[in-house]
Amino acid sequence: DLLVDEDAMVLALKKGKVKRYVSDFPNPTTAGAKGCIVIPHLGASTEEAEENCARMAVKEVRCYLEHGNIKNSVNYPDCDMGIPSYPARVAICHRNVKNMLSQFTTILGQANYNIGNMTNKSRGDYAYSMFDLESPASRELVEQLEAVDGVLKVRVIC
């Protein structure tokens, strides 16, 4: 039921035929062998792993909904500004094209919003920007941001 003949692997490591062996299932044969790198076993197909993944997914979706932070998304990059500490956080999902940030900051500045903190992350064709503002975001501000070509979604987190 093993995927690797561990005795043969240790011998191959000793003879230099294999330089490194990475395993997520440590055992007495390979754990102490020179050239063997042992990592934590994720057990991805076990019932426990499925429960852990479900808990993790709930935690990450909750963090996105409550704070705007993204973690482990398939189509957006990880983006974390922690728990909001300003009166407003505005999150913008948009296309990853030139001049998006300058358009956002111009709109914010012209509407007399001061940015306390901000971040922008991209992955492929998409990007995600968050702005912590020193005053609450108005409906008019959201409408101006939504009107920018390439914006997919604007969310006011708080």
Give the location of each predicted region.
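Rossmann-like dinucleotide-binding domain for NAD(H)/NADP(H)
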Residues: 1-84, 128, 132, 158
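A conserved regulatory-domain signal marking ACT and ACT-like small-molecule sensing domains
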Residues: 71-158
